[in-house]
């Protein structure tokens, strides 16, 4: 069921009712109902308005013992920001430190449907390289222009402490919430084009048009 189904699995893998998940503004609004359905609570870290990298001062204040997961979306919808290597490294360092302090793993859930949609040499680092306890949620809707096919996956970092258990739990969660496999024909088709994308240049063209128009209107924009 695409990244939506992947996120639904990830939230259930790592939380119980009453636990908290932190995410960063601005964010995809459907995160709220996805988390609400698990009984967990989504809390939103206010943005760094200068460049939309993580507001670490606010983040560390909100990272309490009740937090069981941190949800990031990079490249981000709707801001377009790509979290830099220094940002991800600092985030990972904080999560390791707080996991040790609180005596439980704080998982990092990385929502990555826009992973390939970066332009002008911008680096989009692989989140799981920075933090072992990462769960990655992906959709082919954007990279292959297949939004109606609902095809994606949830991947657990092999270095994650509970990787083996979590993979098995995903099957049980699928049965419990009705997110069964997409049709086999689209799974087989996507498997043949894992190293390819649709023509993404139209997105770059649209980006440049919007950027120019916003500047002409007097807005300050980060590109």
Question: Model segments located where?
Answer:
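Short loop/edge segments at beta-strand edges and connector loops
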Residues: 1, 110, 138
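Conserved core segment of the aminotransferase class I/II
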Residues: 133-204, 208-219
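A structural motif corresponding to the C-terminal end of an alpha-helix
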Residues: 97-106, 213, 217
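Structural signal for conserved beta-strand scaffold positions within catalytic alpha/beta enzyme cores
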Residues: 44-46, 136-138, 223
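Conserved Walker B
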Residues: 112-114
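Conserved core of the PLP fold type I
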Residues: 1-103, 116-130
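Hydrophobic "anchor" residues on beta-strands that sit immediately upstream
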Residues: 69, 107-108, 135
């Amino acid at each position: 069921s695409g990244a939506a189904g992947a996120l639904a699995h990830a939230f259930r893998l790592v939380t119980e009712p009453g636990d908290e998940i932190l995410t960063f503004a601005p964010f995809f609004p459907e995160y709220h109902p996805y988390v609400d359905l698990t009984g967990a609570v989504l809390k939103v870290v206010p943005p760094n308005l200068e460049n939309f990298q993580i507001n670490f001062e606010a983040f560390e204040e909100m990272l309490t013992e009740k937090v069981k997961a941190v949800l990031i979306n990079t490249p981000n919808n709707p801001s377009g920001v790509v979290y830099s290597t220094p940002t991800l490294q600092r985030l990972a360092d904080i999560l390791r430190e707080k996991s040790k302090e609180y005596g439980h793993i704080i998982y990092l859930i990385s929502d990555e449907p826009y992973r390939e949609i970066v332009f002008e040499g911008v680096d989009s680092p692989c989140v799981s390289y920075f933090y072992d306890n990462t769960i990655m949620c992906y959709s082919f809707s954007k990279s292959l222009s297949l939004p109606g096919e609902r095809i994606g996956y949830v991947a657990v970092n092999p270095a994650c402490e509970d990787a083996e258990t979590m993979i098995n739990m995903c099957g049980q969660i699928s049965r419990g919430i009705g997110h069964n496999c997409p049709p086999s024909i689209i799974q087989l088709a996507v498997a043949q084009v894992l190293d390819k994308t649709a023509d993404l240049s139209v997105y770059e063209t649209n980006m440049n048009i919007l950027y120019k128009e916003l500047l002409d209107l007097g807005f300050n924009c980060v590109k």
